[in-house]
Structures are given as structure tokens and as C-alpha cells.
Amino acid sequence: MEWRSLPVELQEEILSRVPAKYLARLRSTSKQWNALSKTGSFAKKHSANATKEPLIIMLKDSRVYLASVNLHGVHNNVAQSFELGSRLYLKDPHISNVFHCDGLLLLCSIKENTLEVWNPCSGEAKLIKPRHSYYKESDFYALGYDNKSSCKKYKVLRVISQVHVQGDFKIEYEIYDFTNDSWRVHGATTELSIRQKHPVSVKGSTYWVVRNRYFPYKYFLSFDFSTERFQSLSLPQPFPYLVTDLSVVREEQLCLFGYYNWSTTSEDLNVWVTTSLGSVVSWSKFLTIQIIKPRVDMFDYGMSFLVDEQNKSLVCWISQKVLHIVGEIYHIQDLDDHGRDSALRSSCSVLMNYVPSLAQIQ
């Protein structure tokens, strides 16, 4: 029996279970399937039924690449290796930051003064014009959605850092709403210091580790795109770490990275995983290992990391180097392109899991 002779409802049910990265190839074989994959009802069914198969995305030298981690032999004391694949985004060669939410990528290019939301799976894209004439390198961005609505309403958060003539420091917030294609000023504060250029997203909300400007400690901050409010959450206590970062596991849990205890100058690297994530957050220790080689100043340009719970491994991307940890064994892999123009170096290091989807940009 041919596919075309099957009832349309059955075709839709079967296609809704095909992983997004393979479905993208099938669309080119049938106009009917291509049209079906672009409907909102199918995208919703596909999100519920299809197996999630994450890919790894890396921002290196202002370019976005697919990447992979070779785990073959790690249980026989053979070091895992990191392999850079093909470029994922070819339109703009000067990407300064990239953010992932629900299968959509938010791409920022300060050199070209562009902010774009793109679905690599469907090819759908949307350029977002700034409220004023330009975006700034000191800006922070996040993409999320209203998870209390029957249909996901995507929004972009822009965090603007300003230093006034008198030396006063202020952070302003703007929100871009896709439904009316416009920015609006959301609020301002003089208390926060957000230095993590690459926040993470879980179920539509965004998370950072931030510092209060008036106290020497860090805390956990979330932004709920449904209520459009920030909320302070708890970190594991005590948390006296100089280098911190967040990552996402299985699209539902957060991993927290802490390195270099400033109160004891200990070089222990610690990773925690959330056991509950909501208005109350609980953490469980995943990994502790003493790292000798990385210097603290290696983290000046930021870092990103991924955790593989099944293989008890961690991959950390820092200043053109990849730190691999499997159990209690670690090594450092150099990905530096010697002789390459340093002007192409990204202002931040981004390494993240990307789960393809048919999410539609609204």
C-alpha cells in the first residue's frame, strides 16, 4: 500500500512521530506533507509525539557550527574527543551570541546590528528591529514563551546595561512581543549585575546566575515570560564560587557549574543538577573533581558546558579549549585555530544542546 492511499489522519499520526531532523528531509518529497508540517495543529501534535533527538551547537569564531562528542572507549580509559562539524548558519558570518528555546535560535550580530529568530528545521526566520537605531555589545538577550497560554506566544527579553556620567549603574529591560511586532519598556533596576551572557531556557522561562551589586554573593534568577516578572531562586549553599554557568539536561532540568572557591582558593570543580524546578528549587550534587590546569583568567571570555548523565561526563568550552571530564578523569583539548584573525574570536563561548522542532515563529 502506498503512502498516498492511506487516510490523511493516519499519515498525520505517523509523521507526527518522526524526529524533526528527519522530517525536514521528508517534506521535500511531498507537497502535501510539506503543507501539513507547516500547520500549527501538526506542530503541536509533533511536539507531543516525536522523539527528541538533541544536537550540539557551538559558537566559535563568530560562527555557528554543529558539533559532536566522541564517547567511544571512555569506559576503557580512552579520552573522549570533541569534533567540530559543518556550519549551521551561513547567512551572517559575524554572530556574537546565540540562544536556544523550543527549537528556535535567537541569533545576535552586533557587527551587522541584527537580531534574528530562526528555526533551522523549517527554515522559518524573522528579523527583529531594535526599538532605537542599534543593538549594543553590552546587551543581553533571551527568548521564551508564555507557557500558561493554550498556544505558545514567543517573546524576546533585552537587558540593557547603562553607566551614567555620575557613575550610577542601571539595568533596563525591554520585551519584544511577536503578536504585535514591537518592543516595550518593561522596567529598570540598579541592584543587579548580570554578567552571564548566555542564559538558558527551560519550558519557556529563562535562568541566570547573577550578582547583587551591593553584596558579595551570587544568586539564581529566573524570568517568567507568562507573568513577565523576575524571581530570585536558591542556589546550593554555601556557594562561594568565582566561575559559574548553567546548562540544560533533557529540556527539563538545570545543571549548575561552580569553579574556584574564592573563600578558600580551592580549585575543586562542582556540578549540581536540579531535582525540582519551580518557585522552589532543589539541587543534587552530580560531580566534584579537582582541576589543576585551567587558570581562572581562562574564563574571562565566558564558558559553556554540557552534561551527559548516562556516561557521567562533562564537556566544557573555554577560550578555544575543551575541558573533558569522565568520572574522575579529565583532559584538555585545544581547538584554537593558530594564525586565525583574532578579530573573529567570539566575545562569548557558547556550547549547547539543540533539540530540533517544528515550532512556528509567531
From Swiss-Prot:
Residue ranges of domain F-box in the record: 1-46
Disulfide bonds: none
InterPro entries in the cross-refs: F-box-assoc_dom_typ1 (IPR006527), F-box-assoc_interact_dom (IPR017451), F-box-like_dom_sf (IPR036047), F-box_dom (IPR001810), Gal_Oxase/kelch_b-propeller (IPR011043), SCF_F-box_component (IPR050796)
Name assigned to this protein: Putative F-box protein At3g23260
CDD domains per record: F-box_AtFBW1-like (cd22157)
Superkingdom, taxonomy of origin: Eukaryota
